[in-house]
């Protein structure tokens, strides 16, 4: 028997459905990322750029805000200076030789005249004879003239028809405020010392005390 023919007619045995495995083949685009990867990469890059721009803008804003307070402080200081100047212009002061007390300026005369002349002298200074409003003011005035031997007219006069003491503004004397020593009679005016208030003739010569409202300077 010719064995060569036998071997030549022999076909290799294959199981049904079996296919010879072939070595994997790779296309040129096999290593490239899918299309959506490219889109994601581009979107990420754009997001990073926007984030970077936002950070730059934020840093500029922070620097501006940090530098702004000194400017505002200068503005506030300028405003305070203007307010201070305005406040100075609104300061209330008394004229020379006048004594401040609360909202009043008081003037103690250096000469003696009758009550009416003292009243007129006060009027020439845009003032009136003193109106004592309370006990505290009474003490202040008596301390002001303490050590002086003179007596001083004030804006208090006896009204014979009404049998009462009245201040020159028309108000009636409160007896709890002042106790007047002397007679209550016509043409009587009140004079004050550093200890008491007396009744004296309005025609007698005495010093006087004027008052006026504090003025703006």
Swiss-Prot record:
<comment type="function">
    <text>Binds CLEC2I/Clr-g leading to activation of natural killer cells or costimulation of IL-2 production and proliferation of T-cells in response to antigen stimulation. May contribute to the formation of the immunological synapse between T-cells and antigen-presenting dendritic cells.</text>
</comment>
<keyword id="KW-1015">Disulfide bond</keyword>
<dbReference type="Pfam" id="PF00059">
    <property type="entry name" value="Lectin_C"/>
</dbReference>
<dbReference type="InterPro" id="IPR051527">
    <property type="entry name" value="KLR_subfamily_B"/>
</dbReference>
<feature type="topological domain" description="Cytoplasmic">
    <location>
        <begin position="1"/>
        <end position="45"/>
    </location>
</feature>
<keyword id="KW-1133">Transmembrane helix</keyword>
<keyword id="KW-0430">Lectin</keyword>
<dbReference type="InterPro" id="IPR016187">
    <property type="entry name" value="CTDL_fold"/>
</dbReference>
<feature type="transmembrane region" description="Helical; Signal-anchor for type II membrane protein">
    <location>
        <begin position="46"/>
        <end position="66"/>
    </location>
</feature>
<protein>
    <recommendedName>
        <fullName>Killer cell lectin-like receptor subfamily B member 1F</fullName>
    </recommendedName>
</protein>
<feature type="topological domain" description="Extracellular">
    <location>
        <begin position="67"/>
        <end position="217"/>
    </location>
</feature>
<dbReference type="GO" id="GO:0030246">
    <property type="term" value="F:carbohydrate binding"/>
</dbReference>
<keyword id="KW-0812">Transmembrane</keyword>
<feature type="glycosylation site" description="N-linked (GlcNAc...) asparagine">
    <location>
        <position position="81"/>
    </location>
</feature>
<dbReference type="InterPro" id="IPR001304">
    <property type="entry name" value="C-type_lectin-like"/>
</dbReference>
<keyword id="KW-0472">Membrane</keyword>
<keyword id="KW-0325">Glycoprotein</keyword>
<dbReference type="GO" id="GO:0038023">
    <property type="term" value="F:signaling receptor activity"/>
</dbReference>
<feature type="short sequence motif" description="LCK-binding motif">
    <location>
        <begin position="31"/>
        <end position="34"/>
    </location>
</feature>
<dbReference type="InterPro" id="IPR016186">
    <property type="entry name" value="C-type_lectin-like/link_sf"/>
</dbReference>
<dbReference type="GO" id="GO:0005886">
    <property type="term" value="C:plasma membrane"/>
</dbReference>
<dbReference type="GO" id="GO:0009986">
    <property type="term" value="C:cell surface"/>
</dbReference>
<feature type="disulfide bond">
    <location>
        <begin position="189"/>
        <end position="202"/>
    </location>
</feature>
<keyword id="KW-0735">Signal-anchor</keyword>
<feature type="disulfide bond">
    <location>
        <begin position="122"/>
        <end position="210"/>
    </location>
</feature>
<feature type="domain" description="C-type lectin">
    <location>
        <begin position="101"/>
        <end position="211"/>
    </location>
</feature>
<dbReference type="InterPro" id="IPR033992">
    <property type="entry name" value="NKR-like_CTLD"/>
</dbReference>
């Amino acid at each position: 028997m010719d064995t060569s023919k036998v071997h030549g007619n022999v076909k290799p045995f294959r199981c049904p459905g079996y296919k010879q495995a072939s070595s994997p083949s790779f296309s040129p685009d096999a290593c490239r990322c899918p299309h959506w990867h490219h889109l994601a990469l581009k979107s990420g890059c754009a997001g990073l750029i926007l984030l970077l721009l936002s950070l730059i803008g934020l840093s500029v804003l922070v620097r501006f805000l940090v530098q702004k307070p000194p400017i505002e402080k200068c503005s506030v200081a300028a405003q305070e200076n203007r307010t201070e100047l305005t406040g100075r212009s609104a300061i209330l002061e008394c004229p020379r030789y006048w004594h401040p007390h609360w909202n009043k300026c008081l003037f103690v005369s250096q000469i003696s005249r009758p009550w009416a002349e003292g009243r007129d002298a006060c009027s020439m200074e845009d003032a009136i004879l003193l109106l004592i409003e309370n006990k505290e003011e009474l003490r202040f005035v008596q301390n002001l003239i303490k050590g002086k031997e003179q007596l001083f007219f004030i804006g208090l006069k006896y009204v014979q028809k009404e049998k009462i003491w009245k201040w020159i503004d028309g108000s009636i004397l409160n007896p709890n405020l002042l106790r007047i020593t002397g007679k209550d009679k016509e043409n009587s005016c009140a004079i004050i010392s550093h200890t008491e208030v007396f009744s004296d003739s309005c025609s007698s010569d005495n010093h006087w005390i004027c008052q006026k409202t504090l003025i703006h300077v």
